């Protein structure tokens, strides 16, 4: 959709032998779906030429033509995200939803009205598989929902060995394990930011799906450090995480900076290595790292850098940062970042696309932007997730949270989950800590 302030608009689209014009008397251009798909097919590995003309009074104004590059590599067919008001501590209706990438159809994965309007958060998928996922239910009817095909479990992850229930997840590629951080989180109004979210304690553990047990080592669960945001490498042999020296909170929030570290993991024995490597030193670089995510081919890591802390969505200086894991060199992908917040991000299953959260439109609401990533790590210009109506986002009073690509449609299992929540969850236990 193209919008031009209610004026009459004419748009000419060209690619190879395909050429057509779309007229819009009200200024809202709606391109027919079949014609659009034919145009993209013709323009693969090439570009679409777009010429826009607008009628003002008796005159026509014609803009310079622009070219839209069209990649050969497909994007995954579905995008999953949470929709939530960008408030402080209260909520009413929230849910996890999915959107078809070849249409404007949005359907429900789970809405909190099924469980007395509790908090629903932290959805995660194993290898972009729509049939292997998890998310948390908080407050009333609490637990962690674990889905594996037709099998659904609810886990009670509060134990006497941990400081809280399981929090930020990341699946091992085998599906046998899930890394979680365990966070004691606080939210407060802040003198310089709209709000500030921080941890007063946090650890990292790895959960064994088959045994309902979890394990950790002192380096990942210590009172001397805050450890969070774990993620596995694509081969499953390394665990990345963010860590900072423990300090008095909130007094030291402005000085709290997280480094990016890595420890080896043996999936056969379920054990960790003894050596910890630092990939990004917060003290040396003057930045704090969040959300480390490795591309499916293992070549690049995308993360978020901000001035301090561990909740960058409220920090306008938060930017995406790309590390070449082969050379160890990192840089800011300029095409992705803006003058406002860039935060959570995830890769497509083929590693050629990223989707990320940004507040660049109005500084208030988080919207999903999508960008192409070449095999050399170079990024294309991001575009906002398209909607059927040009003014859709202007009227949407909710933020997009945790956008994740998946390779198919997620089955709605809401009633089954509700029954499990009423029955209570399976207790998990500690095997090594």
Name what the model sees in each region.
Residues 2-433:
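Sequence signature of WD/YWTD-type beta-propeller architectures
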């Amino acid at each position: 959709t193209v919008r031009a302030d209610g004026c009459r608009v004419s748009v000419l689209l060209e690619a190879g032998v395909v050429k057509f014009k779309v007229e819009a008397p009200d200024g809202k251009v709606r391109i027919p779906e079949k014609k659009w798909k034919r145009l993209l097919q013709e323009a693969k590995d090439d570009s679409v030429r777009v010429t826009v003309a607008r009628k003002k009074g008796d005159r026509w104004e014609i803009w310079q033509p622009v070219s839209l590059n069209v990649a050969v590599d497909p994007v995954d067919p579905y995008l999953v995200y949470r929709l939530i008001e960008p408030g402080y501590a209260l909520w009413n209706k929230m849910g996890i939803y999915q959107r078809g990438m070849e249409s404007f159809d949005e359907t429900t994965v789970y809405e909190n009205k099924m469980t007395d309007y509790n908090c629903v958060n932290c959805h995660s998928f194993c290898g972009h598989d729509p049939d292997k996922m998890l998310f948390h239910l908080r407050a009333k009817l609490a637990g962690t929902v674990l889905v594996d095909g037709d099998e659904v479990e609810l886990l009670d992850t509060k134990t006497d060995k941990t400081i809280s229930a399981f929090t930020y997840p990341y699946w091992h590629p085998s599906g046998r394990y899930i890394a979680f951080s365990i966070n004691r989180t606080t939210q407060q109004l802040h003198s310089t930011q709209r709000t500030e979210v921080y941890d007063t304690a946090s650890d990292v553990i790895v959960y064994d799906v088959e045994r309902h047990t979890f394990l950790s080592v002192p380096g990942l669960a210590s009172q001397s450090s805050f450890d969070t945001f774990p993620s596995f490498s694509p081969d499953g042999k390394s665990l990345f995480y963010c860590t900072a020296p423990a300090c008095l909170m909130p007094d030291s929030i402005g000085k709290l900076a997280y480094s990016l570290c890595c420890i080896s993991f043996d999936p056969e024995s379920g054990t960790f290595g003894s050596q910890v490597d630092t990939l990004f030193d917060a003290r040396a670089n003057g930045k704090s790292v969040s959300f480390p995510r490795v591309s499916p081919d293992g070549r690049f890591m995308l993360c978020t850098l901000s001035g301090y802390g561990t909740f960058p969505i409220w920090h306008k200086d938060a930017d995406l940062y790309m590390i070449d894991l082969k050379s160890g060199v990192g840089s800011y992908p300029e095409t992705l970042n803006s003058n406002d917040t860039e935060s959570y991000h995830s890769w497509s299953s083929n590693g050629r696309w990223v989707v990320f959260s940004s507040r660049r439109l109005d500084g208030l609401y988080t919207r999903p932007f999508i960008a192409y990533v070449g095999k050399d790590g170079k990024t294309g210009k991001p575009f906002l997730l398209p909607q059927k109506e040009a003014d859709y986002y202007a009227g949407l009073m909710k933020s997009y949270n945790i956008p994740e690509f998946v390779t198919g449609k997620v089955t709605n299992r809401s009633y089954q989950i509700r029954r499990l929540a009423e029955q209570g969850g399976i207790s998990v236990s500690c095997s090594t800590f």
